[in-house]
Amino acid sequence: MSTKTKSPIGQRTVIGFDFGKKYIGVAVGQEMTGSATPLGSVKATDGIPHWDNLAKYLKEWQPDFIVVGLPLNMDGSEQQLTLDAKKFGNRIHGRFGIQVEFQDERLTTADAKEQLFARGGFKNLKKDNIDAESARLIIESYFEQQYT
């Protein structure tokens, strides 16, 4: 996969990741609509993803770039998980050659849980759903920040 953007700005496809030490949520978004769809999650061991599973999403969706959520403290300062998420993004870029952007993800998990519960009650609050929904919110907040 190459770092060259395949699509014109405004028409690009983006994959978003909600980084976690055990699971990494995945979503896909389209710049044209400013919206994203949750896809699922990839298992990780101490923040290192099962790369083959992650690669399947990249191969299927052929993203023009990737957005990784940055788990900042509420005051905006970094924590160890923030540094781990940056390392994850840098590894993706090094491994697949795809441009990586970072997006503040404060409160996305709480928002994801609230939205999932509203749509399906407690049965909708599965870990996989929460991680993927968080990735969707990360992409959409990136679009809002960039294009509004």
UniProtKB/Swiss-Prot annotation:
SMART domains: YqgFc. Belongs to the YqgF nuclease family. Keywords: Cytoplasm, Hydrolase, Nuclease, Ribosome biogenesis. Its EC number is 3.1.-.-. Could be a nuclease involved in processing of the 5'-end of pre-16S rRNA. The keyword tRNA-binding does not apply. GO terms for cellular component: cytosol. InterPro entries: RNaseH-like_sf, YqgF, YqgF/RNaseH-like_dom, YqgF/RNaseH-like_dom_sf. It holds the Pfam family RuvX. Its main location: cytoplasm. It is found in: Cytoplasm. One of its GO terms (biological process) is rRNA 5'-end processing. This is Putative pre-16S rRNA nuclease. Coiled coil: none annotated. It is an enzyme of class 3 (hydrolase). GO terms for molecular function: nuclease activity. Transmembrane segments: none annotated.
